[in-house]
Amino acid sequence: MDSIGFTSKAVESVRQGQCAFCKFLSANDTGKTGGHQAGIYVPKNAVSLIFPTPFEKGANHDRWAEIRWMADTITKSRFIYYGRGTRNEYRITHCISNHFDPLDEEHTGALLVLVRREWEAYDGWVLNHEDEINDFLAMLDLDPAQVGGVIETSP
């Protein structure tokens, strides 16, 4: 599928999904910094994508769901809240397969789009080229400043 195909499919997925989120993948997300954190950081303003309610510090919480990446590869991924010790953050881990790695260092700076179809099933898209990103944002009438949170769509 060409880049326009992926972009259109990602937009269609957002419009049909229950909840959607997008963010630019950071060097920390992709492991390029060599830090100890694992997986994709999910900001607190987007917790409704992966958990029904936010958690309070004191314990870790997790759940598993399938993510279908780029309309092809499926991973059983872990959504986790780290609430012990000094940590207080949400992440998505276990999202790498033999066929697709959204956390490849070459995806640093790419636009990640994650769409909840239902609580146990998600679509994931990694738009890695400027034209794909600009087309995606334009099709959903989003400003780059709106990236990093839940995508509001009209019914």
Regions found by a protein language model. Give the residues of each.
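Intrinsically disordered, charged low-complexity linkers and terminal tails
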Residues: M1-P155
